[in-house]
Amino acid sequence: MQLNSTEISDLIKQRIEQFEVVSEARNEGTIVSVTDGIIRIHGLADCMQGEMIELPGNRYAIALNLERDSIGAVVMGPYADLTEGVKVYTTGRILEVPVGPGLLGRVVNTLGAPIDGKGALDNDGFEPVEKIAPGVIERKSVDEPVQTGYKSIDAMIPVGRGQRELIIGDRQTGKTALAIDAIINQKGTGVKCVYVAIGQKASTIANVVRKLEEHGALANTIVVVASASESAALQYLAPFAGCTMGEYFRDRGENALIVYDDLSKQAVAYRQISLLLKRPPGREAYPGDVFYLHSRLLERASRVNAEYVEKFTNGEVKGTTGSLTALPIIETQGGDVSAFVPTNVISITDGQIFLETDLFNSGIRPAVNAGISVSRVGGAAQTKIVKKLGGGIRLALAQYRELAAFSQFASDLDDATRAQLEHGERVTELMKQKQYAPMSVAEMSLSLFAAEKGFLQDIEIAKIMDFEAALLSYANSTYAELVAQINETGNYNAEIEAQLKELLTKFKSTQTW
């Protein structure tokens, strides 16, 4: 049978009219593979980087790899029941967490859900976990102190509001203890605290929460938990979630302190995710952007100026600066600070407190190595009296360490060297401090004054801790006015010096230690 051209064209038109275009929604996709918490999705042409993807069972995944014909996403939560062919949907939102003063005193997970059994959160809205750090013009230089309550740190390595001060050391050197004491010392100062626990045992975190509660510091602290049993995705995102909660206070003209415990575990979680997403590995198998991972997080800790706060609050808060101070913790292996992640974080932060195993084991706690610990901006924020009296402490310790090494080889030492060694020994002993016993500015100043002005020279080294405890007790009971004055003003002048001398002379005459 032969068809003419008219019939052929009619037949084609008829077929075209009968053809139904199956319109596939651009926001629906299908899972094509599930491996170790990473899902690969086909479809989702409109998906954005970092977007939340809705999964069955009220779960979400975050899109991290956008490839030509598929998307790599990391599941936030259990993934064992996800299979090929499951439909997923874009949400058009990036991950947000609850913020506000209602979170203070609560323990939450990475997504901001309460896990302390105290009921629902009274939050003040939601904010994204990923934010751009304030620009140069919006910042203000650091000039107010954050007192950690440790003599050795506040005298030698001072921390200012808006600073990033790294706490670095091997395992079991007192890194967490130092950070927790810094949080406890903020009680009554108006500084809001955030403690982010990454990849730790749940029992360890429970112990930290109990200690904060015992010392009355939990009421002004938010605890964000991504324990070792949580997925790598939640461990990687926990610091960003905690930072957003801290920024809420900074942007409203308040002061906040955030502790990341610790960023080594976050880097390991991020490495795991990146390798599963088949991103090319670099040094120590970390991905190429692990520096950016930490820099974009730590740059968000800053001191912002009054104009920024006024603009952010639409004129509600005027003439007040806000700050977010960060104390990131990094765990080293065998004291190796030249490994990839430690060098990265050292270069990002404004100084580091280096804790040493040898010092810790020899009973010097906090085990601060004064030689390589430094605060790059904290000096401008130091309290006047502590700055004046603590100036000779670092020098005394440095000279003592050098002379102690030298004196092992020298049989006979001259009097000046022996005096310097004895002074160094006493200062080293004085720098020891018990956990959960933070000191006020006045107490710290009194101890430093005693060391600086030679009041310890005739005290036995074994008795120095007892001498200090008795001295502080005597000062708080007999010279309460002077203690209150120093705590309030932090000033140091001839009059205060004379009063401190009188206090120490009278105390030494009592011989009550």
From Swiss-Prot:
> Residue numbers for the site described as Required for activity?
373
Question: Where would you find the membrane-spanning parts of this chain?
Answer: none
| UniProt-listed Pfam families | ATP-synt_ab, ATP-synt_ab_C, ATP-synt_ab_N
- Topology in membrane: Peripheral membrane protein
One GO term describing the cellular component: plasma membrane
Superkingdom of this protein's organism:
Bacteria
Compartment(s): Cell inner membrane
Q: Which reaction does it catalyse?
A: ATP + H2O + 4 H(+)(in) = ADP + phosphate + 5 H(+)(out)
Give the EC number(s) listed in the UniProt record. Answer: 7.1.2.2
Mind listing the UniProt keywords for this protein, alphabetically?
ATP synthesis, ATP-binding, Cell inner membrane, Cell membrane, CF(1), Hydrogen ion transport, Ion transport, Membrane, Nucleotide-binding, Translocase, Transport
Q: Which Gene3D superfamilies match?
A: 2.40.30.20, ATP synthase alpha/beta chain, C-terminal domain, P-loop containing nucleotide triphosphate hydrolases
What family is it from? Belongs to the ATPase alpha/beta chains family.
What is this protein for, i.e. what is its function?
A: Produces ATP from ADP in the presence of a proton gradient across the membrane. The alpha chain is a regulatory subunit.
Protein's recorded name: ATP synthase subunit alpha
The gene coding this protein: atpA
